[in-house]
C-alpha cells in the first residue's frame, strides 16, 4: 500500500471522478446559503440540497467536491472531544461524489471499490461493507464487484444505515465502507458491542437516495434516483499514511511541529492534547474568518469565539504569554492556501482578527482562571460548579460555558447547566420579549403558499418607471383577502409584474402610486419575500381595491434616481476599497438609501484620514470620467472568470446580472443603477467607525446631498465665526489662542486644587488618624482629575515617613481611588494591593500601580460610606 500526502489524496480523488465525467464543483463557503436549519455546512451534500429535492437545476448530473465542513454548534457539536480523541475535529474536509438522476447503486459501489483498491492500493482483505438490513440489492453488488462473502457484508438495522433529509422528502439506505487497522488495536466490527473501538474505522459512506417520504406511513420510489457520498479526508489520509490517529497525519504534524518550534515545549504527555486542540482550532478559526465570520457574542460569531478561546486557553497551558494563533497562520496558508485561495486573499485580515481576539481575551483569562480556582478549591472529583459562578465567568470574564467545562474536565468536576441557563434567561428576558414582537416573517407558510399559487413577480423596473399589471393577491393582518375598502388602512399587494423594486441587496424598496379604475393607492415601501415575490406595502387613499383587477404602477422617479445614485456609488466604493486597502476587504452589509449609503466591510483597523482622502479622490475621479454603466446577463461561471465580485454567502442563479462601470468595477448585482458614472455627481464620506471586531462601517453621501452637506458645514462655520466674533481667515488663529489660554487657566486651576489638598507636616500630624504605627489621611473629593489626586498624594507622602493617603473621587457617577504610601513603610503596606481591594469593594475590576502610588476605579456609589471601614480593616490586617 503506497503512502500519499493529504494534498495528493484530495487531488487524486477529484481527478478520478473528473476522469469519470463528474464536474468538479468548488467547495461552498462554511456558511449555508438561505438554510436556517444549519449553522454551518457540515457535509458535502449541503450545497446540492435543492438539486436533490428538484427545486434547483444544474447544468450537470454528476459532481465531485472537496467540501469545507465544520461541526461545532447545535446537533453536530464535537467541540469538547476535539484534541482528546483520534478522529474528532471542528473543521474537516469531506470528499464526495454525487449523481443527480444519472448512475445509482451498482456504479457508485464500483467507483468506490475501484478507487480504494486500484488507485489507492488498499488491501482488499482490510475492507468491509455495511448495508441497510433490507437492502439486498446493495449486498448483491458488493458480492459481484468486491467479491465479498456474507461475513464481510454487515447488515445494520438501525438508522445509522438509513438516511433522510428530514421527516418528509428524499431518503434512502446507506452503505458504509470500513477499514481494519489491525488486531493490535482494540475494537469490533459495526453492530458488535465493541464497535466504538478504533480498530474498524468508517472511511466512506454512500447514500442511495431512492425514496420519497410522503407522510409518516407512506414512502414511494423517486422517479430519479440519486447518489450522495462522503469520505472524510483526514480519516482517509490516516489510513493511507499508516497511522491510527488523524492528528498524526502530515498536515496536522506540520502545524504541530511549527507550533512546537515557537513554544519550545515538547509534544508529549498532556501537552500533546493542547497541541492537537490548537492545530485543529487554527483551521476552523481561519476558514471561518476567511468565509466572513468574525468573533461576536451571538450566533456564528460566538461559535467562532468559543473555538478561538478554547485554543487560546490551551496555548496558555503550554506557557504562551503572547498571542500565538496569528503566528501559526502563515504555516496553514502554506499548507492549504493553494487549494483554498480564500485563505491567501484574507490572510492579513485573518491574522489581525486572531491577534486582536487573543489580546482581548488574555486581559481576562488570568482573572477568570483565578476565580475558577478559588471557587473549585474545595470541590472534589464528582463535584459540581454552581451555575451562578459559571455564568459570572461567561458574563464578566468571557469564558464560554464549554470552556469552563473543558478546564474542569480533567478534575472530573461538572457544571450546573440548569443554574447557568437560568441566569442566562434572566439576563436575556427583555431582549427575548422584544424579539418575540418583531414584525412579520418573510418565511411564514403564507408566503410559500402564495409563491406556489401565483409564482414569481416579474420585475420591469430596469427599463420602466411606469407599467400596467394585474393585482393577484391582497394581504391584511397576515391573511389573504379579496378586497380592501377602508381608507388609510395598511395592507400588502402583490402583482404579476411591477416596476417597483423590492428591498434587497441593500437597496431600499421603491415608493410611488398604484391606480385602478376604482381606487388610488400610496405605496410606502416595497419588499421582496422568498427572493421571488415583490410585495408592495400600501395605504388605500381612495376607493376600493379588488384582487384580479388591472392597475397602473408608477414609481416615484426622484426617489428611485437617488437610490440609483447611491447604489452605483456603493459599487465604486467597493472597488476602490479593494485597490487602496487590499483584497481582504469583503462586503459585510450595506444600505442604499435615497439620501446616503452605508457600507460595512471586513477590515482590521480604522481608516486613516489619508486613506479616506485617497478613497474619496479615486471614487470622484471615476465619477468625473463619466464611464458608461453596462449591465449584462451571463452565466455565473463566466462572470466569476471575468473577475466579477460576488457578495459573500449570496447564492446566484445559473444566469446572473453583471454590472460594469469602466475598468474599475465589475460586480454581480440585481439592483438599479445610473446610466453613466457621471450621473452620481460627487461622493463624500461622512463617517467611518467600528461596529464589531474587524468590521468597519463607512457612510457617505452623493450628488445633491453632498451640496446639502457643504451648506450645513458652511452654516456651522458661520455660526462659530459669529460666536467668536472673527472671520474664516482668522478663525484658526482665534481658536488656537483660546486653546492656549485654556491650557494656562487649567494649569492655574491645577495649582489651586493642589494647594487646597496640600498640608504641612504640622497639619498632617494634626489631621491624620493614627492606626497602629502609621498615620492615615482619608478624603472624599468631588470632580477632581486623577492626575491632581496622584500628585497630591505623592506630595504628602514625601513629607512624612509613616503616612498612608487615600483619596476617593466622585466624578460623573464614576469613582476613582488614589492610594499613596510613604516609601519608608512600603515593605509593610502596598499601595497597589490596597487600591485593588478597594476597587473590588466598590464594584470595580481591580487596579494597580507601584508600591508607593496606585490608582483604580469603582462604580458602586452606595458603598461610599463604608469605604473607610474597609480601608481600616486592610490596614489592621
Curated annotation (Swiss-Prot):
Q: Where in or outside the cell?
A: Cytoplasm
Instruction: Give the species this sequence originates from.
Output: Rickettsia bellii (strain RML369-C)
This molecule's function is given as:
Catalyzes the attachment of alanine to tRNA(Ala) in a two-step reaction: alanine is first activated by ATP to form Ala-AMP and then transferred to the acceptor end of tRNA(Ala). Also edits incorrectly charged Ser-tRNA(Ala) and Gly-tRNA(Ala) via its editing domain.
Q: Which InterPro entries match?
A: aa-tRNA-synth_II/BPL/LPL, Ala-tRNA-lgiase_IIc, Ala-tRNA-ligase_IIc_anticod-bd, Ala-tRNA-synth_IIc_core, Ala-tRNA-synth_IIc_N, Ala-tRNA_ligase, Ala_tRNA_ligase_euk/bac, DHHA1_dom
Q: Which Pfam families match?
A: DHHA1 (PF02272), tRNA-synt_2c (PF01411), tRNA_SAD (PF07973)
Q: Where does Zn(2+) bind?
A: 567, 571, 669, 673
What protein am I looking at? Alanine--tRNA ligase
Q: Which UniProt keywords apply?
A: Aminoacyl-tRNA synthetase, ATP-binding, Cytoplasm, Ligase, Metal-binding, Nucleotide-binding, Protein biosynthesis, RNA-binding, tRNA-binding, Zinc
Q: How is the cofactor bound?
A: Binds 1 zinc ion per subunit.
Q: What chemistry does it catalyse, as a reaction equation? A: tRNA(Ala) + L-alanine + ATP = L-alanyl-tRNA(Ala) + AMP + diphosphate
Similarity field = Belongs to the class-II aminoacyl-tRNA synthetase family.
Biological processes, Gene Ontology terms = alanyl-tRNA aminoacylation; negative regulation of DNA-templated transcription
SMART domains recorded for this chain? tRNA_SAD (SM00863)
PANTHER family the UniProt entry points to: ALANINE--TRNA LIGASE, CYTOPLASMIC, ALANYL-TRNA SYNTHETASE
Amino acid at each position: 500500500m503506497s503512502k500519499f500526502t493529504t494534498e495528493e489524496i484530495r487531488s487524486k480523488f477529484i481527478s478520478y471522478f473528473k476522469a469519470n465525467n463528474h464536474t468538479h464543483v468548488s467547495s461552498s463557503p462554511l456558511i449555508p446559503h438561505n438554510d436556517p436549519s444549519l449553522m454551518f455546512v457540515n457535509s458535502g451534500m449541503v450545497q446540492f440540497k435543492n438539486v436533490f429535492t428538484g427545486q434547483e437545476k444544474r447544468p450537470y448530473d454528476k459532481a465531485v467536491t472537496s467540501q469545507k465542513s465544520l461541526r461545532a454548534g447545535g446537533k453536530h457539536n464535537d467541540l469538547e472531544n476535539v484534541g482528546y480523541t483520534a478522529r474528532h475535529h471542528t473543521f474537516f474536509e469531506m470528499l464526495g461524489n454525487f449523481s443527480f438522476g444519472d448512475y445509482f447503486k451498482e456504479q457508485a459501489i464500483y467507483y468506490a471499490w475501484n478507487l480504494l483498491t486500484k488507485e489507492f492500493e488498499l488491501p482488499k482483505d482490510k475492507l468491509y461493507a455495511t448495508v441497510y438490513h433490507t437492502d439486498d440489492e446493495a449486498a448483491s453488488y458488493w458480492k459481484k464487484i468486491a467479491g465479498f462473502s456474507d461475513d464481510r457484508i454487515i447488515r445494520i438495522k438501525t438508522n445509522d444505515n438509513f438516511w433522510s433529509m428530514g421527516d418528509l422528502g428524499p431518503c434512502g439506505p446507506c452503505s458504509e465502507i470500513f477499514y481494519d487497522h489491525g488486531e493490535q488495536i482494540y475494537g469490533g466490527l459495526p453492530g458488535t458491542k465493541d464497535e466504538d473501538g478504533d480498530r474498524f474505522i468508517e472511511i466512506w459512506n454512500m447514500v442511495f437516495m431512492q425514496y420519497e417520504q410522503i407522510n409518516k406511513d407512506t414512502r414511494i420510489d423517486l422517479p430519479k434516483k440519486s447518489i450522495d457520498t462522503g469520505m472524510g479526508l483526514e480519516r482517509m489520509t490516516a489510513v493511507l499514511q499508516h497511522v491510527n490517529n488523524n492528528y498524526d497525519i502530515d498536515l496536522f504534524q506540520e502545524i504541530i511541529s511549527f507550533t512546537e518550534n515557537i513554544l519550545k515545549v515538547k509534544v508529549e504527555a498532556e501537552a500533546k492534547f493542547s497541541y492537537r486542540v490548537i492545530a485543529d482550532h487554527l483551521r476552523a478559526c481561519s476558514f471561518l474568518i476567511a468565509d466572513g465570520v468574525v468573533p461576536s457574542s451571538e450566533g456564528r460569531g460566538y461559535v467562532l469565539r468559543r473555538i478561538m478561546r478554547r485554543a487560546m486557553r490551551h496555548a496558555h497551558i503550554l506557557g504562551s504569554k503572547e498571542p500565538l494563533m496569528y503566528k501559526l497562520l502563515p504555516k496553514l496558508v502554506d499548507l492549504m492556501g493553494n487549494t483554498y485561495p480564500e485563505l491567501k486573499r484574507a490572510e492579513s485580515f485573518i491574522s489581525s482578527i486572531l491577534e486582536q481576539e487573543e489580546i482581548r481575551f488574555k486581559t481576562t483569562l488570568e482573572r477568570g482562571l483565578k476565580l475558577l480556582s478559588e471557587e473549585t478549591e474545595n470541590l472534589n472529583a464528582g463535584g459540581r460548579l454552581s451555575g451562578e459562578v459559571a455564568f459570572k465567568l461567561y458574563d464578566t470574564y468571557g469564558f464560554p460555558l464549554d470552556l469552563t467545562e473543558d478546564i474542569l474536565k480533567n478534575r472530573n468536576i461538572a457544571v450546573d447547566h440548569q443554574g447557568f441557563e437560568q441566569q442566562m434567561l434572566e439576563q436575556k428576558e427583555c431582549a427575548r420579549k422584544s424579539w418575540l414582537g418583531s414584525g412579520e416573517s418573510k418565511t411564514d407558510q403564507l408566503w410559500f403558499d402564495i409563491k406556489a399559487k401565483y409564482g414569481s413577480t416579474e420585475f420591469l423596473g430596469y427599463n420602466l418607471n411606469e407599467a400596467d399589471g394585474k393585482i393577484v393577491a391582497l394581504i391584511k393582518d397576515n391573511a389573504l383577502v379579496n378586497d380592501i375598502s377602508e381608507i388609510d388602512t395598511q395592507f400588502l399587494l402583490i402583482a404579476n409584474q411591477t416596476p417597483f423594486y423590492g428591498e434587497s441587496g441593500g437597496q431600499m424598496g421603491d415608493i410611488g402610486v398604484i391606480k385602478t379604475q376604482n381606487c388610488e393607492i400610496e405605496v410606502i415601501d416595497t419588499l421582496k419575500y422568498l427572493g421571488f415575490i415583490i410585495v408592495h406595502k400600501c395605504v388605500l387613499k381612495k376607493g376600493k381595491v379588488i384582487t384580479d383587477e388591472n392597475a397602473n404602477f408608477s414609481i416615484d422617479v426622484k426617489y428611485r434616481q437617488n437610490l440609483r445614485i447611491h447604489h452605483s456609488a456603493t459599487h465604486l466604493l467597493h472597488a476602490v476599497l479593494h485597490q487602496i486597502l487590499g483584497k481582504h476587504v469583503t462586503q459585510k452589509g450595506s444600505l442604499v438609501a435615497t439620501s446616503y449609503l452605508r457600507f460595512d466591510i471586513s477590515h482590521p483597523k480604522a481608516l486613516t484620514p489619508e486613506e479616506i482622502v485617497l478613497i474619496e479622490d479615486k471614487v470622484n475621479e471615476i465619477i468625473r470620467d463619466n464611464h458608461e454603466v453596462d449591465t449584462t446577463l451571463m452565466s455565473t461561471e463566466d462572470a466569476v472568470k471575468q473577475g466579477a465580485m460576488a457578495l459573500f454567502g449570496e447564492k446566484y442563479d445559473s444566469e446572473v446580472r453583471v454590472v460594469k462601470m469602466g475598468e474599475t468595477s465589475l460586480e454581480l448585482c440585481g439592483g438599479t443603477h445610473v446610466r453613466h458614472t457621471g450621473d452620481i455627481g460627487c461622493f463624500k464620506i461622512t463617517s467611518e467607525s467600528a461596529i464589531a471586531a474587524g468590521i468597519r462601517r463607512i457612510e457617505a453621501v452623493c450628488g445633491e446631498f453632498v451640496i446639502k452637506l457643504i451648506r450645513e458645514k458652511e452654516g456651522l462655520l458661520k455660526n462659530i465665526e459669529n460666536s467668536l466674533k472673527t472671520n474664516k481667515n482668522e478663525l484658526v488663529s482665534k481658536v488656537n489662542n483660546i486653546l492656549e489660554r485654556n491650557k494656562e487657566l487649567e494649569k492655574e486651576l491645577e495649582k489651586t486644587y493642589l494647594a487646597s489638598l496640600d498640608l504641612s507636616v504640622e497639619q498632617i500630624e494634626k489631621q491624620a488618624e493614627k492606626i497602629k504605627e502609621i498615620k492615615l489621611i482619608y478624603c472624599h473629593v468631588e470632580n477632581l482629575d486623577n492626575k491632581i489626586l496622584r500628585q497630591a498624594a505623592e506630595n504628602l507622602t514625601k513629607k512624612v515617613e509613616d503616612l498612608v493617603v487615600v483619596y476617593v473621587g466622585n466624578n460623573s457617577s464614576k469613582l476613582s481611588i488614589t492610594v499613596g504610601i510613604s516609601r519608608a513603610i512600603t515593605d509593610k503596606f502596598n499601595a497597589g494591593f490596597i487600591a485593588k481591594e478597594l476597587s473590588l469593594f466598590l464594584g470595580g475590576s481591580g487596579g494597580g500601580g507601584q508600591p508607593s502610588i496606585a490608582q483604580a476605579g469603582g462604580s458602586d456609589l452606595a458603598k461610599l460610606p463604608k469605604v473607610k471601614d474597609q480601608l481600616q480593616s486592610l490596614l489592621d490586617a
